[in-house]
């Protein structure tokens, strides 16, 4: 039986994810204690082939050993995939303020901020077992559902999806990144008044960066690094590889380099999505 376990930070979108899986034909169970999972899956395996189970902080054991033991028991008999949903602290605080709901750990007389931090400490052992970590900070409900559908299709196709994204360090490092490359040491078009209003997608900025040997050398060496390890990553039964390229504001250097890397792997026949987080963020403002 295929089992998808949905977990993550409270407010990161577990309910939305579970509904998306239900729409995809999964038999869904919301919030069952982890210790009861082996018994539940034994019962469900008699009538179901695909099950999605949501776990929140209240149903995860404090002991990392107990967690590992339970997951190991399940993996002996079933196909287990764990999806962990993340969002940055400010977004979680805003979502709770908007919904006016209590955080599960607020019952321990903790402030919302303290409850969010405490929860993350509890969840850290589970993150180590996740097959997919999704940062929902900038994802709409529709986009989250689509990413999950892509993940499920990836399970059946056994094909690694590569996401190459640019970002600005001043907005924070993407939480779902597998690799983060810092390009702030490269020549910066920002200091040229004619290039400053443009982005790394525009020809004058691309020409400026392409004219510098160190930029081309960085792109070459980064391609070589990823090319070297990509076959092993593809064999590792994962669905996504997220490569994040960061500069100060996420407008020039990181955008150009992410675009170059993404197009390189597309030309090699890989399934690649290129996204520019800071550019998309600034469009919404």
UniProtKB/Swiss-Prot annotation:
Keyword Transferase: no
Pfam families (alphabetical): PapZ_C, RapZ-like_N
GO molecular function: ATP binding; GTP binding; molecular adaptor activity
Annotated keywords: ATP-binding, GTP-binding, Nucleotide-binding
Function per UniProt: Displays ATPase and GTPase activities.
Taxonomic classification: Bacteria, Pseudomonadati, Pseudomonadota, Gammaproteobacteria, Pasteurellales
SUPFAM superfamilies from the UniProt entry: P-loop containing nucleoside triphosphate hydrolases (SSF52540)
Residues bound to GTP: 56-59
Residues at which ATP binds: 8-15
Domain of life of the source: Bacteria
Protein name as it appears in the record: Nucleotide-binding protein HI_1146
Keyword hit for Secreted: no
